[in-house]
A protein has these predicted regions:
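Intrinsic low-complexity/disordered segments
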Residues: 5, 28-29, 33
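Bacterial N-terminal signal peptides
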Residues: 12-28
Length: 570
């Protein structure tokens, strides 16, 4: 966490000067922004929802759609609320003791991943550690059912204690898909056993209790694909029709040096109805740096269906969504790190992709990051043209032994000058612009590593980095407009609702800004404990999960205040 005792903000004029110093650049030959009306990203979300059997104002997957742009239009969304008095709170409910899974809302239900600290299921009291996916009624907040994932016997190398479910489910009709803490891709019946049916083909649940989940099918990636996730299996899936896209979380061993399963898949495409694996890819291979905890995006770009995955090697990969002849078909790949950057357990300058790639107006946006426990570090945010093919990185690495042939990627450092390596500009580069790099100005406002993703509206891009700096840039050029220091780490992705931007931090504060090229902070609300998740809006209700509680917020609401064990109002 940064030790700065003050909050920073810089005007657009200062940032325009600082951009060159901080590493911002715009690739030559790329069409510049015009005076035409900016894309309406909320229409993309609505169009995506129209393809699913969910309500038109539901929020049925991570970041709302396969485009992964957390932008929405809504009414009655408050600027202020008070979780201690219940002002503008419709309801709140207990979660586990640690919550890293984001809430989603579909067809009258709210789903959120956490641990078992709330103890909703009698056969697993709250002193039993589980990965828990919990389903609540969206209107009342009443508990409906929980999918209970017992801890893996291998322990923290695969299933870190108390972390619970870190992924976010996707819902379509009466089906739900998510990645469990046990390394399983799971399809559930969204009704659970409340419909008095045990949906199959899987019918081996331990019981048919109405407070537990009804599993339709599941794929054990550790058993069937020999995947070895590092610490936690975390991927928030997305779909294109009947295709389900998954990142496996395959990573290093407990010593953080070796990869136990470097030939196992990193990326999957599955039939979401049957659980059949349609194609796999293991491109990151032995070059995975740590874990693989990003989530896929999907879009039709340049007339081609593309499934886009952030790799644990720091590369972004795009594949033909449907594959070819039962195999993965790579369209392009992009190294998101400078070639001379180096990976180390502490103080690395090379990073992998943790946040989710975002698609906006035909371009792809992604930032690099790292497990927050591995300290802070410099970051890089990229805008990429997805219509090019092959290796579309900004530069290529060669070696003096064969100076005309690019060398293969290397794990810890791509370009080692002492070994005769050198760089050349890539004439096939798809980089539109880059933002970040070393903090030469030493004002702590450079782009740091990021766990979250960007949100974009009206060509204004917002992203919070792990060090707690909230950045606003021009989405077309990468020009910085302003930055604000939140004085606390942030793992969250911003939410843009109407002309407001919401972002949370690990101190438990939600800051609200005007969606503007001029920095205007409107409000800051304390949530009583850390907010590692991202705010969402569904059906004119703002949902925020802090470390141990889920809140449904709406202008004019008043939750009943109860004094039970010091709990917040509900």
């Amino acid at each position: 966490m940064l030790s700065s005792p003050f909050r920073h903000s810089l005007c657009g004029v200062c940032w325009a000067i600082a951009a060159l110093v901080m590493g911002g650049w715009l690739a030559g030959g790329v069409p510049q922004a015009t005076a035409q009306e900016p894309l309406d990203p909320t229409k993309q979300v609505r169009d995506s929802a129209d393809q699913l059997k969910i309500g038109g104002k539901d929020w049925g997957q991570w970041l709302g759609s396969p485009y992964r742009n957390n932008v929405v239009v809504a009414e009655k969304i408050p600027l202020e609320w008070d979780v201690t008095t219940g002002k503008n709170v419709r309801w709140s409910v207990k979660l586990g003791s640690e919550t890293y899974g984001n809430p989603v809302v579909a067809n009258g239900k709210v789903y959120v991943g956490t641990n078992n600290g709330a103890g909703y299921v009698p056969r697993f009291p709250n002193n039993v550690d589980l990965g828990a996916l919990i389903c609540f009624d969206a209107e009342s907040g009443n508990f409906l059912w929980q999918h209970c994932n017992e801890k893996l016997p291998t322990g923290r190398v695969h299933d870190w204690p108390d972390q619970g479910i870190c992924s976010v489910p996707m819902i379509d009709g009466d089906r739900l898909w998510y990645v469990s803490s046990r390394g399983e891709v799971v399809c559930l019946d969204s009704e659970g056993f409340l419909d008095d049916e045990n949906d199959g083909p899987f019918t081996g649940e331990p019981n048919g209790n109405k407070d537990e989940a009804d599993v339709v099918w599941k794929l054990d990636m550790m058993k069937e694909l020999k995947v070895s996730q590092h610490n936690m299996c975390s991927c928030s899936v997305t779909c294109a029709g009947e295709l389900l896209f998954v990142i496996t979380s395959n990573g290093v061993d407990e010593g953080h040096v070796n990869l136990p399963a470097d030939a196992s898949p990193s990326f999957l495409c599955m039939d979401r109805n049957s659980g059949k694996v349609l194609w796999t890819d293991s491109s990151p291979g032995a070059n995975v740096l740590h874990g693989q905890w990003s989530s896929p995006a999907y879009g039709v770009l340049g007339g081609v269906e593309q499934a886009i995955f952030g790799g644990g090697d720091g590369w972004l990969y795009s594949f033909s969504a449907r594959g070819k002849d039962g195999k993965a078909e790579l369209l392009w790949k992009f190294d998101c790190n400078p070639k001379k950057s180096r990976y180390a357990l502490r103080g690395a300058t090379r990073n992998h992709v943790v946040g989710t790639p975002v698609i906006y107006d035909g371009l792809v946006y992604v930032a690099v990051g790292e497990d927050p426990e591995h300290l802070e570090g410099e970051g890089h945010l990229w805008c990429i043209d997805p219509t090019k093919r092959g290796d579309v990185s900004p530069t290529l690495v060669f070696n003096a032994a064969d100076p005309n042939k690019p060398i293969a990627p290397k794990r810890l450092q791509a370009c080692v000058e002492t070994e005769g390596d050198f760089e050349r500009d890539n004439t096939n580069s798809a980089a539109v612009w880059h933002y970040g790099g070393e903090d030469i100005e030493e004002n702590e406002l450079a782009m740091h590593r990021a766990v979250g993703s960007v949100a974009i509206k009206n060509n204004l891009l917002f992203i919070a980095d792990q060090s707690g700096v909230f950045h606003c840039l021009d989405a077309k050029t990468g020009k910085p407009h302003w930055a604000y220091h939140m004085e606390s780490e942030s793992w969250a992705s911003p939410l843009i609702v109407n002309d407001l931007v919401y972002i949370g931090d690990s101190d438990g504060e939600i800051a609200i800004f005007r969606c503007s090229a001029e920095m205007e902070k409107l409000s800051e609300v304390y949530m009583e404990s850390a907010c590692f998740t991202s705010p969402i809006v569904a059906n004119d209700t703002l949902y925020i999960a802090n470390r141990n509680r889920l809140y449904a917020l709406q202008e004019g609401a008043q939750a009943k205040v109860e004094e039970e064990d010091g709990e917040s109002p509900r």
